[in-house]
């Protein structure tokens, strides 16, 4: 089975040079409809799909009569104009397959600020659970030069990391990684698989080569590094053919970046090895047994909360004797955790005034010792 077909959760990134006709500034609806059919086929076999789509600035600037190079405020105005047209194009294409589309606008801060990261992840998880296809773009309308991601390759990789995706496909104007830029060097050799981003691999990166696309091979290798560390497989391939996802499955040329671990394993390694605990939760015997059986940690099983931590921080989990059982990412702040400890999940809203997660630490965010 191909890495694409094996993915339970798939991210698809489309550059603006693929989605927007260079000569007219219009969305390439015929091509988009074939991609929508591919996405529908993925969903029909049980896969979850998230799209990261460029093109808002490219579409919007034509409508506003803006001529490149654009100032930051002109790009933002173009994005505001183009985003609504882009959303309609995606909605129309997927509606033919009875698929609900959700527009999500993100900035780099949403993926690096813990609170915003958790909110964005929760929203995306909920949309996927409800059967929708989230269509994500960088929020160019409010992003500044200092906080812009700068390319949707990197944004797509951050999203893949955020939702523990199994695979990310970067559609480009080139069919994969070569030892040199094949458009300039006839002796450039194609690289079908990469297992590690060595200095030699990084030296193979080329320059951007399309009128609209701002993501060259350099940004794609940055995305690959993020994906490999997150246990997510990533492909670089040409997006121009009709039915581009099906083309990959049918053996179309692409470069696969293959990690050594799965997303869930990589995420737990990150929690265990990279995050410093900022607090401690002490459990009763029943909660300790539940965790040993692979279940989530509920507020009812907490007997003591110590430390100062915020939602999304890492905390130690101990039993009543003080033995460390594990560590995990907590869904409530220290103050809120103290307020709901020992209480049933159904009481959370009445106590805190809002309804968050039922679990204090979800099992996917928990790493047990040993």
From Swiss-Prot:
InterPro entries: AceGlu_kinase-like_sf, Asp/Glu/Uridylate_kinase, G5K_ProB, Glu/AcGlu_kinase, Glu_5kinase, Glu_5kinase/COase_Synthase, Glutamate_5-kinase_CS, PUA. It catalyses: L-glutamate + ATP = L-glutamyl 5-phosphate + ADP. GO terms for biological process: L-proline biosynthetic process. Pathway: Amino-acid biosynthesis; L-proline biosynthesis; L-glutamate 5-semialdehyde from L-glutamate: step 1/2. It is found in: Cytoplasm. Its main location: cytoplasm. It is an enzyme of class 2 (transferase). It comes from the Bacteria. GO terms for cellular component: cytosol. Keywords: Amino-acid biosynthesis, ATP-binding, Cytoplasm, Kinase, Nucleotide-binding, Proline biosynthesis, Transferase. ATP binds at residues 13, 172-173, 214-220. CDD domains: AAK_G5K_ProB, PUA_G5K. Disulfide bonds: none annotated. Residues 278-355 form the PUA domain. It holds the Pfam family AA_kinase. Belongs to the glutamate 5-kinase family. Catalyzes the transfer of a phosphate group to glutamate to form L-glutamate 5-phosphate. This is Glutamate 5-kinase. It comes from Paramagnetospirillum magneticum (strain ATCC 700264 / AMB-1) (Magnetospirillum magneticum).
């Amino acid at each position: 089975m191909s890495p694409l077909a094996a993915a339970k959760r798939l991210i698809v990134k489309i550059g603006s040079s693929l989605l927007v006709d260079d000569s007219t500034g219009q969305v390439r609806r015929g091509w988009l409809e074939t991609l929508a059919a591919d996405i529908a086929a993925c969903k029909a076999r049980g896969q979850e799909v998230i799209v990261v789509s460029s093109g808002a600035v490219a579409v919007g600037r034509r409508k506003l009569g803006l001529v490149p190079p654009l100032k930051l405020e002109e790009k933002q105005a173009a994005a505001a104009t183009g985003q609504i047209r882009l959303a309609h194009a995606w909605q129309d294409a997927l509606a033919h397959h009875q698929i609900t589309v959700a527009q999500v606008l993100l900035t780099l801060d949403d993926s690096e600020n813990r609170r915003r990261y958790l909110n964005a992840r929760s929203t995306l998880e909920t949309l996927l659970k409800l059967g929708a296809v989230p269509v994500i773009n960088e929020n160019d309308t409010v992003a500044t030069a200092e906080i812009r991601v700068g390319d949707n390759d990197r944004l797509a990789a951050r999203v893949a990391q955020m939702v523990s995706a199994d695979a990310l496909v970067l559609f480009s104007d080139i069919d994969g990684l070569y030892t040199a830029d094949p458009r300039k060097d006839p002796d450039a050799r194609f690289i079908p698989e990469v297992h590690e981003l060595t200095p030699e691999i990084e030296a193979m990166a080329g320059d951007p080569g399309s009128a609209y696309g701002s993501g060259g091979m350099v940004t794609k290798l940055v995305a690959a590094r993020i994906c490999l560390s997150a246990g997510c497989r990533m492909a670089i391939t040409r997006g121009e053919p009709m039915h581009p996802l099906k083309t990959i499955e049918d053996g179309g040329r692409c470069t696969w970046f293959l990690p050594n671990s799965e997303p869930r394993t990589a995420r737990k390694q990150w929690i265990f090895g990279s995050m410093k605990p900022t607090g401690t939760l002490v459990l009763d015997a029943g909660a300790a047994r539940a965790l040993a059986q692979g279940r989530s940690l509920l507020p009812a099983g907490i007997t003591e909360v110590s430390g100062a931590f915020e939602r999304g921080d890492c905390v130690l989990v101990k039993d009543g004797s003080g033995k460390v059982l594990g560590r995990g990412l907590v869904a409530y702040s220290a103050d809120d955790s103290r307020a709901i400890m020992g209480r049933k999940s159904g009481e959370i809203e009445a106590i805190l005034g809002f309804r968050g997660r039922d679990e204090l630490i979800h099992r996917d965010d928990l790493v047990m010792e040993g």
